[in-house]
């Protein structure tokens, strides 16, 4: 995980160009109008944090003295959960329910609880384990699959994401998903669920936006900075999210800032004074047809103020929500840190399909062999292997073995492995040197005539086709064809039946050509990078059955998988993500390099085949990379495939 803590003001200015490039707030005369008046004074409401309930006049308050309070529109108490609480966030849980998250001051534990807003009954609280740092703030996030997460913001840059619920319910126990490196002066956070975006303040520096999804990268982008590098006069404080925009407090200057999202940046709309408030610390908003309703807490007086802002952010176009398929098993994490696991290949045991194997490359170690339960069975430390492919029935001396071939970046060669057809044991079977300077991808082609060919590609776009031979007992390769693409390729897969080769050009798309050695290497576009397929184009796999054949592509740029017909005109059948399997404790898959798929009946949940994908970001818990095993039946059901 990479995190840059920007401390150099000149670097901030160079990075953002905010002072010169960001549109300045509207003039005060043209700014949206806001008038605040005290709220809850007659009921003597004192709260450290407050939230409005969408579609209702009721409010939820967190109080150090009185606990969690459900209040009516005038501040009168409707329900109470005793205790001492600070910091608050909530999400709906059905038409008459909500889930609240707050910090229990007595135990310094984040606490979640459901509330029926009709009967005013509290559910059983769920508490996170006590942390080894002081928790300053928290916020909830519900993803596209309706998994509920809690973010913790702590002192000295500590941050965490926890899985706490599914659908409308809290889980029986919270599960740690990942750690986050946050600014050391962070205290507040908010999440835009629809955009999967986490906002965090850095008091004396500015406001930051991070991807909220647990499978996303941890890169951050600025929303605004403290002067002279941005529009915040003195400080960055609490925030509130509206569709397409953000509201943020500058407590030291007693001002409210409005932002409109524009692409991947935020434009400052207005900076409004908050007269009568000395230190506005908390803010809660609810968007309505008439504008934006606000609640603001003044820390200096302890009073709460309400008002309506005659401004609404313009909703922005969001990426389409892709369906999610859960992995049923996952491999043991690889034995090397960083970008290590890369490409899987499925070997089908001809005698006992349930005893099939998943071979996986570790590009910092060698070849790994797993059972269908994900347990590591063999390690072959033969060098930095990148891609791997498998074909049955290779003649090696007097034996007939199944053959795995991997691209070896240490030697720029093809590493060959014999697979015992009875036991599944994998053994090195030789090397075939190539003239490639930086070998990357590899795939095999086995036409009906029985020969075995290997396609190897390099970073410079070259493809070399070798005819493999093992009759002498030692594997060898003869170069029979060469062609190239204009930029870096990697993934490839051959359709043995139709003698067609699919190749991926990472920043461009997928091509098809004749796989036969004697044929001209004429490239035909299958799919270009665009709205559905996002660079980098990585792993390619073929699902072949009696009903229909499909090409599966790793769309690394948006952590998804694209499915096409494997025959012209290569019709798009859909795209999906490999998501969280909370019940099994398996995280989703992201930043996938290689994949493989088979239609073979491997028994049990794999009776329609299996998809294996490399997971570039292992979460829940955070560990080294691994491979996720997905039942093809679930992919077919999700996309409506034959």
Describe the residue ranges of each PLM region.
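Bacterial N-terminal signal peptides that target proteins for export
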Residues: 2-10
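…; additionally, a secondary subgroup of soluble metalloenzymes is captured
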Residues: 13
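C-terminal motif of bacterial Sec signal peptides marking the signal peptidase cleavage site
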Residues: 17-20
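Sequence/structural signature of beta-propeller domains
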Residues: 22-642
